[in-house]
UniProtKB/Swiss-Prot annotation:
NCBIfam families attached to this UniProt entry: BGlucanaseBglS
Cross-referenced SUPFAM superfamilies: Concanavalin A-like lectins/glucanases, Galactose-binding domain-like, Type I dockerin domain
Name of the protein: Xylanase/beta-glucanase
Assigned EC number: 3.2.1.8, 3.2.1.73
Species whose genome carries this gene: Ruminococcus flavefaciens
Start and end residues of each stretch annotated as B: 245-523
Active site: 124, 226, 684
Family: In the N-terminal section; belongs to the glycosyl hydrolase 11 (cellulase G) family.
Annotated region (Linker), positions in chain: 524-555
Lineage: Bacteria, Bacillati, Bacillota, Clostridia, Eubacteriales
Domain GH16: 556-792
Catalytic activity: Endohydrolysis of (1->4)-beta-D-xylosidic linkages in xylans; Hydrolysis of (1->4)-beta-D-glucosidic linkages in beta-D-glucans containing (1->3)- and (1->4)-bonds
Amino acid sequence: MKKSIFKRYAAAVGLMASVLMFTAVPTTSNAADDQKTGKVGGFDWEMWNQNYTGTVSMNPGAGSFTCSWSGIENFLARMGKNYDDQKKNYKAFGDIVLTYDVEYTPRGNSYMCIYGWTRNPLMEYYIVEGWGDWEPPGNDGVDNFGTTTIDGKTYKIRKSMRYNQPSIEGTKTFPQYWSVRTTSGSRNNTTNYMKDQVSVTKHFDAWSKAGLDMSGTLYEVSLNIEGYRSNGSANVKSISFDGGIDIPDPEPIKPDENGYYLKENFESGEGNWSGRGSAKVKSSSGYDGTKGIFVSGREDTWNGASINLDELTFKAGETYSLGTAVMQDFESSVDFKLTLQYTDADGKENYDEVKTVTAAKGQWVDLSNSSYTIPSGATGLVLYVEVPESKTDFYMDGAYAGVKGTKPLISISSQSVDPPVTEPTNPTNPTGPSVTKWGDANCDGGVDLSDAIFIMQFLANPNKYGLTGTETNHMTNQGKVNGDVCEHGSGLTEDDAVSIQKYLIRAISELPESYLEGHDPSKTTTTTTRITTTTTTTTTTTTSKTTTTTTTTSPAMHGGYRDLGTPMNTSATMISDFRTGKAGDFFASDGWTNGKPFDCWWYKRNAVINDGCLQLSIDQKWTNDKNPDWDPRYSGGEFRTNNFYHYGYYECSMQAMKNDGVVSSFFTYTGPSDDNPWDEIDIEILGKNTTQVQFNYYTNGQGKHEKLYDLGFDSSEAYHTYGFDWQPNYIAWYVDGREVYRATQDIPKTPGKIMMNAWPGLTVDDWLKAFNGRTPLTAHYQWVTYNKNGVQHSSQGQNPWG
């Protein structure tokens, strides 16, 4: 499997999974080198956990099982039929059809497949139905053998080699054959409801037809759940070998009345678009205030966003209209390219240009060709967007495919348009239906678990449960408004399903849980005019943009401490002013633990707004929560945003804790728990010496950039301002409005959440000194701001570190 590195524990195993998945308590194996096998009800099963790592479980039944894994190296759980004692080729067994009904929740590198071996010759095979954050088997050393359509699904046929690796016959060299769905049947960090059948014999026939050796004797056919350095769970409700699902012959897509075969405005998520190469695709803002997708993490220029085209609809030699709208906000100008990847009649991969356009920074452009002819003999069609001369992140909206001459889905205005941002703006209240009952997503008049499930179905399968879905009881506009109970005004997300469940178990007292800034009816309407603000105490500076100078006199002694820092920028893009008694864009982490070296559970009662400030505290543990991998002794406080933020200036007003073994922090973070690489930028004050601050950052999990700076004051005695200006080619750290350090190498590029926490350490005495158990300890924060336009301090550019 893909060799990904899991550096930071996931924030939490999703509440959705814990509520919906398990109906029985499985036997759990803690950090043992497990290989358990058995038979039940005529089925063979196996659970395997490599290298004595993590926490795993499998609970087998007759034609069913549940499993879970966390913190593992490599894990698999499988169940099926063993044919080895018969020593026959697959053709002797007639049509082998495996039918499955599975709830599959991958959180990282994982896949669900039909799996097995043959002997004489030795061969390992996979028929992959769905995966998490990585499509197997990757591209290194992999040969392509075209595509095949079986059971109404199109699969790529691939071959890889394993040299001197473990097998059913000991350490051997052997091939692996793969059928991989061109579109995954699952999504990462989501509970996927997967019910289908796999005509296994037809895959064997397709491999043989493609020239792969299928002369061996069949060893087994199993349904397999596998994970590599990831977390996840599965509820395999049934496996059978009798078919039982009537799969109609596939038919080509018919164009709608406007000529579109496919149209995706991304209002309900990423649709069928996925990351290509290392790129990640996430729902974000789009053109003209709508939703779109954000493409990030491009480690090579050909990485981007891609979609597989149905070959029954899009035929070689015929002409179509293909396109999308794109925008980048990070370089002065780049060329976008729409490309068709295909396999020709000789089995060779080709890349044909559909359209190329130039886009200035912040400018939406139309990347479409209304008359593109698919090359003769082309199969395995993949349409993708790339930036050939740059690795910049970019935005997309309005992707479509239609008959020749069909107009683009979005008509790009010639006037200047503000680029979309991942942080919240202050939109006016949208038009549309008003709420009839908070949480009633399925509009049945009540609020229960079925509403949370319905939201997850809507997000996971918009073709069935979307506003125009095929299911009779699909989502309605009224249901979307009712169900939008977390950050109301931001649209339906998994967080809304979680909020409903929190309401049902009385973790929160009412719905909605929160409003998107500007959507709370108790607030007055605010302007959305973008203003660049220079904050000083004495001067006003005017540039070519509208520039004002604002002096904010901070109320004294919030939380009992003086304010000796610079004033808050009242015109920043995002402002969370805890002095008002409100959390702004933040929420408290509650009921989970990171793992080492964080010797605490995060609880919301350790993160409170009181006495004109946010107070993050370390105290004794409040509950009897247990974790088999890591059982911290204390409780800690953490505040984090729901939204992701990118380049710009981040600043907070903070008073730190003073005690050996503790940390007060302000940072941005994203990682595997967000389906992203580990990127992080830190400001940390170590309680052992509060006259210093530590700066640090991680890029794709690589750190070792620590820098200690002498403050010249004790940060535990008063509020001071701490900030960093994050740009594509540098990070500059600030203290009280003055730049004090700058880094220019291997700068992070993935948007992250803004976070603050207070925590005690364990096993890191050489870094923090040993924690003596003193509680309570409290760090105080007055406000946090983010300014998309970067730093505005008058001392910008000073760098005493050279």
